[in-house]
Amino acid sequence: MIVLISSITYAQKGSWYIGGVAGYGSNTTEPTNGTKSTTTSWAFGPEIGTFLKNDIQLGFILGLNGSTDKFGDDKTSEFSGFSPTVYVRKFKKVTDNFSLFSGLYFNYLSGTQKEFNPDDESKASGFGISLGIGAAYALSPRFTAVGQYGLLGYSSVTFKQNDTETGKESDFNVGVNTVGSSSFVQGNGSGAVFNIGIYYTFK
């Protein structure tokens, strides 16, 4: 689930908006003869931004997320991630209530993976850049429905174990989560390629 808050079609230069993304998920596998396994995950990304011009939007998302794996009642692994994102969007007004936009997203990627049987810890850090497109429809002077699709994305992540570099991973993908993702760091949103939300604006 993703929830975004701001207003676009009625926004003017100097307008500010707040909002964010939030998500939670849980998956349990319980075989007929065996021990159940459970994975839970969450994501939270408060957002703030402003309009530099009537059609140029600058925003920042502070991305936090994590997950836990259990086998029976025993925790087997745990992940925590931090992925702040800065973005710039350019809007094109089609009608009084409807606009199209394109956006460029830059994000820092970091995360820690802990294994408990046996004890082990891996860390990763890097960066990502992506291009997205979307549409905005004004429901009222304050509320706007927004949908966005991640077209292209590139990320580069370095992995370390006990402060020793163990590898690097670079990805270039068509169809990406515009608020940050990689195989190690899932970012600050739902991980979805297409996101829909409601925005709210204030002066």
For the regions a protein language model found, what residue spans apply to each?
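Outer-membrane beta-barrel translocator domains and adjoining extracellular loop/strand segments
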Residues: 28-39, 68-79, 111-125, 158-166
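Residues on the lipid-exposed face of transmembrane beta-strands in outer-membrane beta-barrel proteins
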Residues: 20-24, 46-50, 64, 86-90, ...
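Outer-membrane beta-barrel biogenesis signature
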Residues: 1-19, 90-93, 99, 202-203
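Short glycine/proline- and aromatic-enriched beta-strand/turn motifs that initiate or cap beta-hairpins
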Residues: 10-67, 71-72, 185, 189-203
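Repeated loop/turn-to-beta-strand initiation elements of outer-membrane beta-barrel proteins
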Residues: 55-58, 96-98, 137, 142-145
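Predominantly the C-terminal beta-signal and adjacent terminal strand-loop region
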Residues: 70, 139-203
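Residues that define the transmembrane beta-barrel architecture of outer-membrane proteins
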Residues: 16, 38-44, 78-84, 98, ...
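Outer-membrane beta-barrel proteins
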Residues: 32-36, 48-50, 74-76, 90-92, ...
